Design a protein with these regions (language model features):
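N-terminal intrinsically disordered/low-complexity leader segments
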Residues: 1-7, 172-186
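Residues at secondary-structure transition points
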Residues: 1-9, 13, 51, 55, ...
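Solvent-exposed, amphipathic alpha-helical segments
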Residues: 17, 21-24, 71-75, 105, ...
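Hydrophobic alpha-helical connector segments
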Residues: 59, 66, 70-100
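Amphipathic alpha-helical packing segments from all-alpha helical-bundle domains
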Residues: 66-70, 96-98, 115-142
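Hydrophobic alpha-helical segments that form the core
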Residues: 101-107, 126-180
């Protein structure tokens, strides 16, 4: 028999499994029963950790956004300017293709912004990412806007299954996205 898991470790496990379920089914379509089953706990226990489905969705969404923030910090790795944006863009693009649930959870979070609590948290998380990219790159707002716009376009292309470069029609688009990640001013 395995040792008992601490509540903190169990919360992390629940959030990880919730991301998988919410990424696939969205806020409305996902059930706490499915999440509890994936974790191997009862629904009453799940609700002791997260009193409502919304609380669990918010925790999963925040974890997903924090992973994006960490990715940007790690990718920049002391670089500044366009070099930082290029490194962050490359890391982001790679994660989009290697961690589909991460992408889908982002999209499900945006789709759930009809809910004021989700919308508020999403704004705060996006602001934190925006501020960090500004701090890491030191670039003008126009460069950062293009960087974020390209990232959102990459989200759509990845969701449609075309970020992998396997479709010749999309090759020029992908090359343009990868070239000079956020350059307005050279």
């Amino acid at each position: 028999m395995s040792p008992r898991m601490s509540a903190e470790d169990r919360r992390a496990q629940v959030i990880a499994e919730a991301i998988t379920v919410f990424a696939r089914f969205g806020y409305e379509g996902a059930t706490t029963a499915a999440i509890a089953e994936r974790v191997g706990v009862s629904q009453p226990y799940l609700f002791r950790l997260f009193p409502t489905k919304k609380d669990l969705f918010l925790a999963a969404s925040e974890k997903n956004m924090n992973d994006t923030l960490s990715l940007m910090r790690e990718a920049a790795g002391g670089k500044t300017g366009h070099d930082a944006l290029d490194a962050m863009g490359q890391a982001y693009s790679e994660k989009l293709t290697s961690h589909r649930e991460w992408l889908l959870m982002q999209l499900q979070t945006f789709a759930a912004c009809y809910d004021e609590d989700v919308q508020r948290q999403t704004r705060l998380c996006l602001q934190e990412i925006w501020d960090e990219v500004e701090k890491l790159s030191g670039l003008q707002i126009e460069d950062r806007v293009i960087f974020f716009a390209k990232g959102m376009f990459c989200n759509v292309i990845a969701a449609a299954g075309r970020l992998d470069g396997q479709d010749e029609q999309w090759t020029p688009v992908l090359e343009a996205l990868k070239a000079h990640t956020g350059r307005v001013h050279d």
